[in-house]
A protein has these predicted regions:
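A structural signal for multi-pass alpha-helical bundles of membrane permease subunits
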Residues: 4-345
Length: 345
């Protein structure tokens, strides 16, 4: 309210209204539409027609299924309100309860349900990559910070290259190194004197995808931590030298507490981004072995043999993905708000 008291309300509205309208049109409205669609069954009304198909050797009549059009030439949609049926079809609680009652928590049987198979990989991918990104990013920042000034610029540029590369292109580059007669695959085969097929099993592809995400995202953590190191109080560092503190003690008691808010920031960004893993599956052509929640959304939006898209299920999967992101962020956000209140007191 202090800002509003310093200026007229009309002036305040003039400054804030564009941002507010942008948030409504590009965030709130699409989200509301997706929520509504997740409770609906949307499908084109189809009918069969005879169509003559000709080639250099003659013509023949074939029967094809096409969408039914109205008088204005638009597709006629079959929209039904189905409540939580889309969520039920995705989560399959009945099938899950039957598996648990008959075989207990048998992961081999539970992962036969697409959603839980995708959820397992999404969570594994998200939480396994996080500590590597934080630790490697901090180590790189500390090493670069210790370099002489002449070397810092070139090293920073080289370190940021993986983050600059488009994700799909980066994934394809890693794939080409290991697939078939790739450079690294050929080298390993020569070294071990046996054939290697890294892309023949899901676990090896998954390891490559984890490696790629760490390689691609670590530069982001590095540049954030490196910028934070420039703001560390040098007087505290000098005082720690006088007190006889070693490098590890300076890191633990001075540097990490100082950059802790940025560690939380990097963690939040990574968790939100990694939970929506999609580029790696496309780049590594891994959809036959591995699926994620974001891939499920894309898969539902692809045309089936009848020319339909499962928009309702895709919307439901998107909402479940958003709920999952909120759940994994809650502990970090609670800790952040708690620390902020303590500082204010």
């Amino acid at each position: 309210m202090g800002v509003i008291n310093l200026m007229k309300k009309s002036t305040f509205l003039v400054f804030t209204m564009p941002s507010f309208l942008m948030m409504v049109f590009f965030i709130a409205a699409p989200l509301l539409i997706v929520i509504v669609q997740s409770f609906q069954f949307n499908q084109d009304v189809l009918h069969t027609i005879e169509r003559e198909k000709c080639d250099p050797f003659g013509c023949k009549t074939e029967i094809v299924t096409v969408p039914l059009l109205d008088t204005d030439g638009r597709k006629i949609k079959n929209n039904q309100w189905v409540g939580f049926q889309n969520y039920s079809n995705i989560l399959k609680f009945d099938q899950l309860s039957n598996i648990i009652s008959e075989k207990g928590f048998s992961w081999k049987d539970i992962r036969s349900i697409d959603f839980y198979k995708a959820l397992r990989f999404t969570l594994t991918f998200t939480f396994l990559t996080l500590p590597f990104i934080l630790i490697l990013g901090l180590c790189l920042a500390l090493c670069v910070n210790a370099l002489v000034n002449k070397l810092k610029g070139p090293v920073i540029f080289i370190t940021l290259l993986p983050f600059i590369i488009t994700p799909v292109i980066g994934a394809l580059s890693i794939k080409w190194l290991f697939i078939g007669d790739g450079i690294l695959t050929s080298f390993l085969e020569y070294l071990l004197d046996k054939d290697i097929a890294i892309f023949s099993s899901s676990w090896s592809i998954e390891i490559l995808m984890l490696f790629y995400r760490v390689w691609h995202t670590t530069p982001f953590a590095f540049v954030i931590f490196y910028a934070a190191l420039q703001t560390v109080d040098k007087e505290k560092i000098e005082a720690s030298f006088v007190d006889g503190a070693n490098r590890f003690q300076r890191l633990r008691y001075i540097i990490i507490p100082h950059i802790l808010p940025l560690i939380v920031f990097v963690s939040l960004i990574h968790l939100m981004d990694a939970y929506r893993v999609f580029d790696e599956i496309v780049g590594f052509s891994a959809s036959g072995y591995i699926t994620s929640l974001q891939w499920m959304t894309y898969d539902y939006l692809k045309l089936d043999d009848a020319g339909n898209r499962y928009i309702g299920r895709a919307s439901a999967t998107s909402i479940l993905t958003m709920i999952g992101i909120v759940i994994i962020l809650i502990p970090i956000l609670k800790k952040t708000f708690k620390d902020q209140k303590e500082r204010q007191q």
